Amino acid sequence: MFAACTLFLAACGKQTVKIMTPPDASNRVQFSAEQLQTTLDKAGYQVMMQQGDTTFSDPEIKTILLTEVNDTTLKKEGFHITTTGNLTKVSGRDGSGVIYGCRELIDCVNDSDGKLNFPEDLKDAPEMVLRGACVGLQKMTYLPGHGVYEYPYTPESFPWFYDKEQWIKYLDMLVANRMNSLYLWNGHPFASLVKLEDYPFALEVDEETFKKNEEMFSFLTEEADKRGIFVIQMFYNIILSKPFAEHYGLKTQDRNRPITPLIADYTRKSIAAFIEKYPNVGLLVCLGEAMCTVEDDVEWFTETIIPGVKDGLQALGRTDEPPLLLRAHDTDCKLVMDAALPIYKNLYTMHKYNGESLTTYEPRGPWSKIHTDLSSLGSIHISNVHILANLEPFRWGSPDFVQKAVQAMHNVHGANALHLYPQASYWDWPYTADKLPNGEREFQLDRDWIWYQTWGRYAWNCRRDRTDEIGYWNHQLGKFYGTSDENAGNIRIAYEESGEIAPKLLRRFGITEGNRQTLLLGMFMSQLVNPYKYTIYPGFYESCGPEGEKLIEFVEKEWKRSEEHTSELQSLYLI
């Protein structure tokens, strides 16, 4: 993008700009035009909006034509920008392609102090098929009367969920970073979002809250849809709504119970109602946590979940297939996918990139084999940058680390999609651990902007030239911190050098990884010097960093002077 903006036709001062859209412009094309208009207005241009007539009739006026084209040389979500004289055409392979083509123009305006430095000829499209971030409707404590993962959507538990202005800011951030999916994590969301004719008592919130939820989720999915964003609802299995379970004398979750016709019917109808009611939604299915056997996983996925999705589509008269994601956690993904792919094609698998941490851009070992096995199943594989306890609570944002990590997702794991957790404070969304001078808490989107921008940029294209990227990030950081690109280079170096610290510390000194790891949460001396006294994950050491030694192994070699070191610890020791 940064390099593309160097190819331009310079505009002479502030002027009138016309934005033309066809008479049948889709909601995504109209959204693109509005976003472009807002940017040009802020840059001081007089903007004329023209829908219907797309004839370039006045060569004296700078004109931008937005259109969807049936150009099979472009990938999905791809675009083609051409500039000849005063006419710039943005042609999208689809509505999302127009959105991203307009984002290219918007970035060119913002990165050139408001000049209309548009590309003369540029084609681009994303590498990764799904590129998205998640927000959790979950908490670290149980609600009264509920079990783990059971959090109905209510203003008391999640007041931020009902803040439309905050959602618009979040969705616009996703668009600006070329992301096309929003993942919402919750144990059993359906009883907060849909009513079932056969099970009216299953609703888990009061009528007033249900109306709020209905209105908010409709708002969220509609706003996401016009931005080309799928809202993908995650849920655990098998979890029942509390009033449904109580009505039939059941537990809300019981890992040892078999699938019954009643439980299957309730879940299938819940999924169907969800698909029918809300636009541009998908599902992220976790078969782990509350299922009995792998055989049950296959039956549940193919005879309950997929039929529920198809029922919802049939009610709408739709023939497309929304994305259906299968999380590899605690299930046999291959067995499930082998049974599911013949009956549903738009399937994805998902697995954690470095487990529940961020430790390396050189993954290897048995955990990497899980990824390669999944990516060979015949569907798109998603790399999940999962909860990142080793980065807590500090800000982190190394462009170099992220670019290399995304390259590893492609080259080592075979992944072609991204699921991204917040950089820190997942359980405390939307706030960070920081306080502002006025005593208010800082928002994650304000503090951790570089987290989303780096992952979004490299999910779109991880093959960018490193020299160009240094220039790009120097400029971005210079704009953000109000300094020159040259001075901002020092900030970038600080981000990149400090970005190696937490990953290296955990992969060499931690006893495990993720939301259970103790390195930064209060590690005992005995855990540091003799991890074998505790539960360690051998796969972590074998997979989430370069080959090396634990501290106890390093010291033993030093004591015996019998073997050469094979560890990053040697360089740390020499320092």
Question: Which residues are covered by each model-predicted region?
Answer:
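Catalytic-core regions of glycoside hydrolase
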Residues: 160, 180, 204, 211-219, ...
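Surface-exposed patches in mature extracellular/periplasmic domains of secreted proteins
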Residues: 45-52, 114-121, 185, 287, ...
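Acidic, contiguous N-terminal accessory segments
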Residues: 3, 11-85, 115-119
